[in-house]
Amino acid sequence: DDPESKSHGQLISEIYAHLNKQQRNEYFYMNTLLNKLLCGIHNVNTTSAFSQVRIGHSIADFVMINGEGRVYEIKSDLDNFDRLYDQLRYYFCAFSKVSVLVSIHELEKIHEVLASFGDMGDAVGIYVLSERGTIFNKERSREPSIYNEFLNHSSIFKMLRKREYENIIRAYFGVVPQVEPVFHFSAFLEKFEEIPIIEAQKLAFQEMKKRNKITVEQFQKIQPELKAVVYFSGLTSKMPALDQLLKIQYRG
């Protein structure tokens, strides 16, 4: 077909369909996961999702926070499991529930790999992206278990923005440390460490969840193939302009 007879939106849909058939990369996994979680199981009014969250020396592919926090590590067919142990260990420093999302071709392998990780591996959830694009198939999935062996205040605290940890300390203690700017971070971390770890984690998640500014109506209007791009880039305010661009005929 002549691409110049189609709109930008139509071409993006065709490229995405090609990815689905030929090369399901990390974006395809992430976008599918976001669509399934925020359009199906949860909704954007009660749930916030984040991508590329730094935890220790690793970066979590996908984090979801509603009443609890969950990490999803994406392993597409283009990835391997060489660094998985270290990645999971870092994630468990801040989160109690961690899962791995793999392709159907890697299902047997991921069970073997996680089994070699001992108790930590046993706690990790397993989800599978099927050929039909489903993820939460009960027969193939394994729900994550709570695992707090590595949970620590510092890892949780370092995910927070300045305003967020200030809100937590002010709400919990009624006062905030009065220190020179150079000591600000360490003084607030010291107070944060006085909060019981599970409570500290809960308060951190409550603050992080407030970052989500998109409504259900706005989210539903985003072209399915572009939901992750718009959601994680904070482009909500530019959606009218994006909608117009997607309707314009491609000119080469």
Task: Report each predicted region and the residues it spans.
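A conserved mid-domain beta-alpha-beta active-site/ligand-binding segment of alpha/beta enzyme cores
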Residues: 132-212
